[in-house]
Structure formats: C-alpha cells, structure tokens
Amino acid sequence: MLNDREKILTALREKPLKIYEVMKRANLPNEEACQSLLMKMRDEGSVKFDIHKGRWHIGD
C-alpha cells in the first residue's frame, strides 16, 4: 500500500495540480494534513509550488 507521500508524487507525475486536485487524485480526505505534507515535501525539495499559477509540481 502506498503511503501519502508516494500517492502525492504519483498524482503529480502527470501534470502540476492545485491542492484540491492533489487531494482528489491521492485520495486524501483532510486538506490541512495534505497541505502540511506538501509543505514538508517542498522543504525537502521533492515538490515545488508555482505561486503564479497556484499549482504544485514535482521538484527538479
């Protein structure tokens, strides 16, 4: 079974997504937990946030 980090990375492989799209594709019911995890992953460099488009994508 995939953990939440793997689910998020799998969801973002196709294209950059907004927070609600990430939650829907990764099947995460709690917005706050999802956003908190995305922020941790951003700090680690695994994902990035485009402030102009409001979308998350896999870090380079």
Feature locations, PLM:
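Short, cationic-aromatic polyanion-contact patches
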Residues: L2, F49-D60
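Short amphipathic alpha-helical interaction segments
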Residues: P29-K40
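Residue-level "edge-of-site" marker
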Residues: R25, S36, G54-R55
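Short acidic, hydrophobic short linear motifs in intrinsically disordered regions
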Residues: L17-A26
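Glycine-centered, phosphate/nucleic-acid-interacting loop/turn motifs that mediate DNA/RNA or nucleotide
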Residues: G45
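Short helix-to-turn junction characteristic of helix-turn-helix DNA-binding domains
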Residues: A11-K15
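Short, leucine-enriched amphipathic alpha-helices that occur as contiguous helical runs
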Residues: M1-L9, E31
